[in-house]
Structure formats: C-alpha cells, structure tokens
C-alpha cells in the first residue's frame, strides 16, 4: 500500500504540483487550509507525512504547524514546510515547531521529490 501524504496549501497550483510530482509514488491528499487539514487529521487515518505552508488563509502564520507540534502529532508524523516567508524566520520556526525539512517558495520540484523519498524511506511501517 502506498504511503499517504497530506499536503496543505492555499495555492491550487501548488496543490496540483504536489499531486502531480508525488502522486505516482504516494497517495496524496490535498486540502486548501488549516481547518480542513485539522478536520482531516481528526476524522481520517493519519498520513505518513505532512507537507504544509505556514501561511494559511484561515489561520495566523505558523498556527497549523504549531498545532501539530502541540497536539502530540509532532512526534508521530514528520512535517515538511513549504514557505514563502523569510529564510531566517522559516528556519527558526521550523526548529521551534519540529519540522523535519523546509523549502522556500519557489522550490525545485525534483529536490522536493528526492527529499520526500528520503524521508518516507526512513519511516517504519
């Protein structure tokens, strides 16, 4: 069975790109905002990996990422951040909230795919 990735980004283009690039190897579920992601996480099986933008239209910056780190999901589900914010802020917040990797937008899809493959290969079934 394919590993599942939850992708959270308000950009339809980014969600489409993630689905296209990662969908061949993974089951990719995309949602446009933080509340949809939280609903999904509370009502569905947990994904193996979460890719999320820290700037979501329905939440303050970093609120969803912070929620993951304080909800107990942080240790169970690796989080990769796709950020359009300043590199220094992104680095410090990723460390603070336990994200395993980050990419600044615009990002290289091949580098992202390689990084995701590396991360998923280390996950225990």
Give, region by region, the residue ranges found by the protein language model.
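Active-site residues of response regulator receiver
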Residues: 53-54, 83
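C-terminal output helix
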Residues: 107-116
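Short amphipathic alpha-helix used as the core "switch/output" element in two-component signaling
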Residues: 39, 62-75
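Acidic, metal-coordinating helix/loop segments flanking the phosphotransfer/catalytic sites
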Residues: 32-49
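Conserved acidic segment of CheY-like receiver
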Residues: 2-12, 18-19, 50
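Two-component/phosphorelay signaling modules centered on CheY-like receiver
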Residues: 12-30, 97
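The feature encodes the CheY-like receiver
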Residues: 57, 87, 106
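Alpha4 helix (beta4-alpha4-beta5 surface) of REC/receiver domains from two-component response regulators
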Residues: 63, 86-101, 114
């Amino acid at each position: 069975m394919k590993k599942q990735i939850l992708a959270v980004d308000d950009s339809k283009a980014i969600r489409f790109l993630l689905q296209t690039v990662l969908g061949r190897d993974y089951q990719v579920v995309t949602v446009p905002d933080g509340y949809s992601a939280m609903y999904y996480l509370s009502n569905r099986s947990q994904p193996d990996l979460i890719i999320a933008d820290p700037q979501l239209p329905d939440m303050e910056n970093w609120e969803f990422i912070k929620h993951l780190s304080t909800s107990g999901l942080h240790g169970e589900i690796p989080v990769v951040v796709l950020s359009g914010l300043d590199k220094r802020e992104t680095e410090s917040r990723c460390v603070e909230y336990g994200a395993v990797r980050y990419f600044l937008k615009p990002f290289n899809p091949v580098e992202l795919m390689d990084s995701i493959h590396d991360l998923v290969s280390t996950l225990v079934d």
